[in-house]
Amino acid sequence: MGYQEKKQIVLDELEKSLGAVKEEEVEQFVDMICDAQQVFVVGVGRVLLMLQAFAKRLNHLGIKANYVGAIDEPAITEHDVLVVGSGSGESVVPLEIMKIAKKYNAKIVHIGSNEHSSMKEYEDLFVRIPC
């Protein structure tokens, strides 16, 4: 299988996944980010790597973004948004971070695939990416 065939497989997968994401959830997510004073991201493993890249891109756009656990991480406030990436919605560390952020009245966005997870009671918005 050559490059073009492999490329098409990847593009088809992306189209299938992103085509199932609800536009109104993404629009609300964007609005929450734009309205926040700061954006924080948390996840585990590969999800965390992608969220760190996302935070970097937000900073390039002039939106102050941090990842939880960074040495220079500021405090979260009620004016901020926490973006949690967890497909299962059961990742222990992100779930505990959500609980803390909720105590500070931060807005919480959960990006994942399981809409009936333990994170449900803490999220203000769930953006489902089916897999």
Model regions and ranges:
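Short, flexible segments with low predicted structural confidence
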Residues: 4-5, 29-30, 72-74
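Generic secondary-structure signature for well-ordered alpha-helical cores
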Residues: 16-23, 63, 131
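Generic N-terminal amphipathic, Lys/Arg-enriched alpha-helix
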Residues: 1-20
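Glycine-rich phosphate-binding loops that contact phosphosugars or nucleotide phosphates
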Residues: 41, 47-131
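A short, well-structured juxtamembrane/interface segment
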Residues: 18-35
